[in-house]
């Protein structure tokens, strides 16, 4: 029997994620709660594909550990490591939705993007250069209308292809000072991890993410060296590390949307 393929469905609240999940799985769903929390956990088998399980993650705006939903989604992605992520984004609100995308592509898990509500985008007379966006983000993009069911199986098939494809290595999208610090952190603290996971952890260490620092328990001496690197970037860019990452994500998104 073929190995089961796990695909995580991720996106902002109200982007059409639940509609897409229902379209992909039909009545073939299991609903429960995530361990230890009251956040609803939904998974289902892809229609006509018994070997493909779709996990509907809670709607989130980012992978920061600030809300229960974010913690649940993030824990699933970094500990369970699904075979692919199907990231549904609302085409009418591209900039805000891509903020999560930039974080998902750092996980070293293959990502496929489903741009939802493309019918409305066109109706509004707007245009999205899907080909250019796909090239910039390094992942396949499928246009869908979750409500009408257009393109939904194409999106699932693309996610299956991505899951069976080669390993993905995250792209470098930050400014020189940040990338310099991240490279040092990778070398100093996370070089023993699988290559595709190193960058995400290094970025989180740069942001001084409490949950990651707690999990990794980096030796004090190493952490002192890392702090020097972080502070150097903060001084050069005149902001705190977490704000620097946030701002640079939005700068990157603005650049790729302009195409």
Regions flagged by a language model, labelled:
Residues 27, 36, 59-60, 91-95, ...:
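Conserved nucleotide-binding/hydrolysis micro-motifs of P-loop NTPases
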Residues 112, 122-259:
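Alpha-helical transmembrane helix bundles of large polytopic membrane transport and channel proteins
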Residues 20-21, 39, 54-56, 73, ...:
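Residue-level signature of catalytic and energy-coupling elements of molecular machines
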Residues 46-49, 72-141:
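Conserved C-terminal guanine-recognition region of P-loop GTPase G domains, centered on the G4
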Residues 32, 66, 97, 123-126, ...:
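Alpha-helix N-cap/helix-start motif
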Residues 1-66, 79-80:
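Conserved G1/Walker A P-loop phosphate-binding module
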């Amino acid at each position: 029997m073929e190995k089961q393929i796990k695909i995580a469905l991720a996106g902002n609240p109200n982007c059409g994620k639940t509609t897409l999940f229902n379209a992909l799985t039909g009545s073939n769903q299991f609903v429960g709660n995530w361990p230890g929390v009251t956040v609803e956990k939904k998974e289902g088998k892809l229609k006509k594909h018994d070997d493909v399980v779709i996990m509907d993650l809670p709607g989130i705006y980012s992978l920061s550990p600030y809300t229960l939903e974010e913690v649940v989604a993030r824990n699933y992605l970094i500990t369970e490591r699904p075979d692919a992520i199907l990231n549904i984004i609302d085409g009418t609100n591209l900039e805000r939705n891509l903020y999560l995308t930039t974080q998902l592509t750092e996980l070293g898990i293959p990502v496929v993007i489903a741009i939802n509500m493309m019918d409305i985008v066109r109706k509004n007379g707007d245009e999205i250069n899907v080909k250019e966006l796909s090239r910039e983000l390094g992942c396949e993009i499928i246009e869908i209308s979750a409500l009408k069911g257009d393109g939904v199986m194409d999106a699932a098939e693309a996610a299956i292809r991505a899951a069976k494809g080669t390993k993905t290595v995250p792209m470098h999208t930050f400014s020189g000072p940040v990338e310099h610090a991240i490279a040092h952190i990778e070398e100093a603290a996370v070089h023993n991890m699988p290559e595709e996971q190193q960058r995400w952890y290094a970025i989180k260490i740069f942001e001084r993410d409490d949950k990651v620092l707690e999990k990794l328990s980096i030796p004090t001496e190493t952490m002192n060296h890392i702090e020097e690197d972080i502070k150097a970037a903060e001084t050069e860019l005149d902001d705190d590390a977490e704000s620097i990452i946030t701002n640079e994500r939005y700068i990157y998104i603005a650049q790729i949307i302009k195409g």
